[in-house]
Amino acid sequence: MIWTLLPGAVFLADGCLKKKAEEELKENEQIPVCKGHIVLRKCHNRGVAGGGFADSTKKVEFLTFFLLSGLWARLGALAGRRKCKAKKLGLALTIGGGMSNWYDRHKRGYVTDYVSFRFGPEKFRRLVFNVSDFCIFFGLALLTAISCRESR
């Protein structure tokens, strides 16, 4: 049951943060937090992570919906299994983050990002993220680690 609620929780939490970013952050405004290591700023991303495919919003939207459908099906197939908690967690985080970003893209034509980091390589410093991006990343990292372990 929790595995079907977690994607909804991610979706709602990030939706609230995106709304707050839209309402309270001005264009080009940067608010440093955590001793300047993290920066809050509003960015409208019409493409995928890093801004790729910005001119193909509808294609990205369709592909995302298709992939999310497959992930939901996989999560449903694991529903009754007790030993697959880590796999279910990875799927639930990925689905929740994907749903939130898909919804933004579907309703607005862009995804609202609001967090940057002031450390690491310059390319990394230029990227802007949202909570859904982190959930997708950690969910996919967990699923990859499980897959690597199972293939041994």
Name each region found by the language model.
Residues 1-152:
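Alpha-helical transmembrane bundles and membrane-interface segments of multipass inner-membrane proteins
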